[in-house]
From Swiss-Prot:
Residue span of region Disordered: 322-344
Family: Belongs to the DDI1 family.
Entry keyword annotation includes Cell wall biogenesis/degradation: no
Full protein name: Protein DDI1 homolog
The enzyme's E.C. designation: 3.4.23.-
Active site: 205
Keywords: Aspartyl protease, Cytoplasm, Hydrolase, Protease
Organism of provenance: Leishmania major
Lineage: Eukaryota, Discoba, Euglenozoa, Kinetoplastea, Metakinetoplastina
Biological process according to GO: proteolysis
InterPro entries: Peptidase_aspartic_DDI1-type, Peptidase_aspartic_dom_sf
Role: Aspartic protease.
Mechanisms controlling activity: Inhibited by pepstatin, diazoacetyl-DL-norleucine methyl ester (DAN) and nelfinavir. Inhibited by the proteinase inhibitors lopinavir and ritonavir.
UniProt-listed Pfam families: Asp_protease, UBA_4
Amino acid sequence: MVQLTIDNARGVTLCRVSLPANATVQQLLLQLTVAKPELRQAQAIRNDVRHVTHRLTPASTTTTTTTSVVSSNAQTLLQAGLVGQGATAETLVVLMAADAPAAASSAAAAAPSPTKAVAAQILDLFGCASASPSAGVRSQASVVPSTMDERQLELQRRIYAQIQQQQIDENLANALEYTPEAFAKVTMLYVPCTINQVLVKAFVDSGAQNSIMNKRTAERCGLMRLVDVRMRDVAVGVGRQEICGRIHMTPVNLAGMYIPFAFYVIEDQAMDLIIGLDQLKRHQMMIDLKHNCLTIDNINVPFLPENDLPALAALGDDENAMHAPRHQDPATTATTASNPAAPVLSEGERQARIEGFMTVSGITDPTQAAELLEAADWNPNVAAALLFDT
């Protein structure tokens, strides 16, 4: 199947259709008239990339065919030269009565500039990616046409990056509009408990394989005498921490219930106590997020509100907020990342950058190239982004 993008003489996309390469021109016209009835008056179909203009007979402009009509419209798209052998995507221009004479006299002059041609191919690439699955999988040859030289390929990469950033920005805007709750701060799950009459705020973490207690809390609760040093080891997760040993059993008071817990004692652990998956499964505890509590049998232990969380949890939220990524304009990001301050360039260096930027971008006016580079603090990547934005 070939994905055909149908444009008018002004470059406006009218529709997209999918046909096999051996389909006839008449079959193409039938599909076009279904999508756009006004296209039944088409006079010619042109492929600017292949420099082919296929004239249509009057009989082909109707939506019915007869066996007595034998015209050029009976040719296949391949025979007419409108599509290439093995091509998966083509752009065709439909010429109406007012467009055909002018197009015939100035076909070469109407050829798009290299920059606009590459931009159109990239936009077509993204449009085909969001089309129906019947459009087929684009081959590598259609993504990087053999007609492109190195300068066009560099332009293609920059346009691709610009369009990708625009789609990321649109995705962020949609998320902010439709799912703003995804950006809200999540309150950590802590429950109050008592060990040897010492109040401890325990962090409930179903992602922790074992329940752990830091050495400072074990000393505060008078449990160091129960630490089995034969269980010394090294905990490997986010970093490495030394395990002092294991407390095989100690009663923990949760909402008036004395439950035997086992803990590994960590030398340097930020959280006082973590109830891990081992004890959650052992005592069949259920994390009930709907009612915001830890359920043990028929008893609910409410999670601590945000204002009662340990100072460490609040500090961690603040640090996460400080280091959270913020949205920035792609041009601004590139400027601040690559050039914190405008570089001081000599006249020769500026002239060299202007010539290099003109070579890559296809700009023929040195004044325009210099203005774009000055606006981008002489960063060619940012200047290219500004060029494509305009």
